[in-house]
Amino acid sequence: RNVTGVQTCALPIYNFIKNLSLDLKGNTLVLFSRVETHGAILYEKINNNKGEDRKVFFIHGGVDTEERELVREITEKENSAIIVASYGTFSTGINIKNLHNVIFASPSKSRIRNLQSIGRVLRKGKDKVKATLYDISDDCATKSKRNYTLNHFIERIKIYNEENFNYEIVTIQLKNDGNRR
């Protein structure tokens, strides 16, 4: 582990997610599992590299309901907002019609959680013609540890097959050489 407590293997993945979220067109929801070790890091990386006119929000269990509702209302009127949110706060019960992309930034194998999370981007919007899910997984296994991220990804692929989702698996070789931006 490095000084901030982030696994070295995770650094290029965080940078990839940062770059992906900043490059996507439309409003994007980045879902994470753990506030301190995932969400706060992703939010900081994205927010520190965004354009001046781009809105980036950080939502987790410590954010009150009124602020979450305000973020939802703002996002409905935006074209390029990024919401970095915990699964617990934004995977269910949030209705944002003007949401174009969802990024699964943390592993989960829960069928209900995954389908509910995908449902966030499937809401029909006024000018929305496409909804895209980016399901991020890594293969950072070590000899002494199982790679739960990859195992959970395999479980999600089974769900996508059962639900007849169209998907493409893209392998990207990441380098641990810092930030693109």
Show the residue positions of the predicted features:
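Single conserved hydrophobic/aromatic residue that forms the stacking wall/gate
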Residues: 2-5, 9
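Conserved strand-helix element at the start of the C-terminal RecA-like helicase core
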Residues: 10, 14, 18-45, 160
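Long, largely alpha-helical accessory region at the distal end of helicase-like NTP-driven motors
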Residues: 13, 27, 165-181
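Short, high-confidence coil segments that cap the C-terminus of an alpha-helix
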Residues: 25-26, 53-54, 79-80, 99
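Residues at the starts of beta-strands that form the adenosine-phosphate
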Residues: 27, 55, 129-132
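Conserved helicase motor "Helicase C" RecA-like lobe of SF1/SF2 P-loop NTPases
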Residues: 29-63, 67-70
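Conserved RecA-like P-loop NTPase helicase motor core
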Residues: 60-163
